[in-house]
Structure formats: C-alpha cells, structure tokens
Amino acid sequence: MALMEAWYPASRAESWDRVGLIAGDPSAHVTSILLAVDPVSAVVDEAIDEEAGLVITHHPLYLRGTSFLPTSDPKGASITRLIKNDIALFNAHTNADISADGVGDALAQLVGITSSSPLVPTGIDQAGRPIGHGRIGSITPTRLGDFLDLVAERLPAGPHGIFGSGDPGTIIERVAVSGGAGDSFLEAARESGADVFLTADLRHHPASEHLEGGAPALICGSHYATEWPWLPILERKLVQAASTANVEVRVKVSTIITEPWTSHRPTLGGRK
C-alpha cells in the first residue's frame, strides 16, 4: 500500500472519487497480486483461481457508497467472496489518471507520443514531473487514417472498437489523449493545438458541437480499452519494486475483458 500511495497519492484524487484500500488487512503480507480495470465478479473468480492475496483495480467498487452488503447484490457478493478468501481489494482511480506513470502516460506511450505533457496540468510531483489530466505530445507526422489503424492495433481487443472523425488523408503530428470519459476535455484538446484527440465515452452532442467548431479530429475508443494500458506499466513497477526489495511477489494483469459489451454489429438500415 505504501508503494501505491507513493506513486499515486490519494490526495490527488478528485473530491468525488473513492480510492485506496476497499477491503483487507493493510499489514498483511501478500505474494500474489492481480491487476484489473474493474472489480467485477469475473475478476473475483480469477483472483480466487490465481490464489491472489491482493487485487488492484482502477475503478472503485463503491463509487457512491453503500449501506448494505448482501450477497444477493453482485457487489455485496463480490466483496463477501474476497473477504472469505482472504483477498484484499485496492483501487487507484483519478489519482492514477493524473500521476506520472499513470493512465495518461500509458495511453500516450501506447500510441507513440514522445515528450508528452499534461493536457490539463494540475501541479508538479515530488520528482519535479508535471502531472495532470490527459497528455499531449508529438508523433511522427502521419495520415489520420493510418494513425486510426495504429490505435486500433494497439488498444486491447474488444467488441467496441474505435470510432474516428476527420479526413483520413489529413497529416497529423500533435496528439492529445485522455483515458476514460473525455467529454470534459474537448475544449482543452482544442486549445492545446492538437490535430487529433484520442479518448473514450464521447456523447453525441458534445462531440457533434466540437466537430462543428473544427479541429482537432476525434478518435473514440471504449472506456475499458483506453484505461487498460496502465495495467502493464503498474505490473512492471510492482515487479521492479519487489526485485529491489528482494521480495518474491507474483504480479499478473487480469485476462478478463471487463467491457460491458460482448458483441458489435454495424447498422445497415436507413431511408432509401
């Protein structure tokens, strides 16, 4: 827990967020850690099968709190099963979004952005690195259509896929990214001078109004897919820290795709 707090301090989380140890003994010794985006029942199954002592997720189990934990409720059942199997649950959410080596950096690195900086700066960390929401930087100049293909190849597989806007032949160089819901950063992406903004969960009206105003072009992936790239980075950090401390810990990224959608079909109807 001390490592997670050092890398992704809870004080950086948004006021509405819930981050930290959700269940478990903070002093317990663990030898196996499972990493996932969402604390859903399938991830709990995997944690039990893997005999994990700790599950670290990006999203909290109870963002808005609860007064009851019956096993008749899916979340109540999950937390009960975790406790019965002596598995702790921890999460880092918006504090991981803005921190160095967090969700923003992971997505930027995945799509080849170099020398990125926060799209919406919030401060400087203890190491003197700028932190904040999203990232912006440069890639080798390329056609928008080719960049769309690259994003599709590198994001984790899932039924959602990606959506793109703009002329695919346009040459782009400045790229802004924000993992997860990106509606609130559309204006920041425009003001940054980005040629394209990669994010997720864009709603119809904000996206349409943004595009009416011109650049940047938009690429919309799924919430899960744009936040998942952080997990391999966290895996490496935990493994390296364990090696430095001469401690044996097995760390694994969950194999469960926690997209809510399981299938996709292009719509083909319309007026003739």
Regions flagged by a language model, labelled:
Residues M1-K272:
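Hydrophobic structural segments
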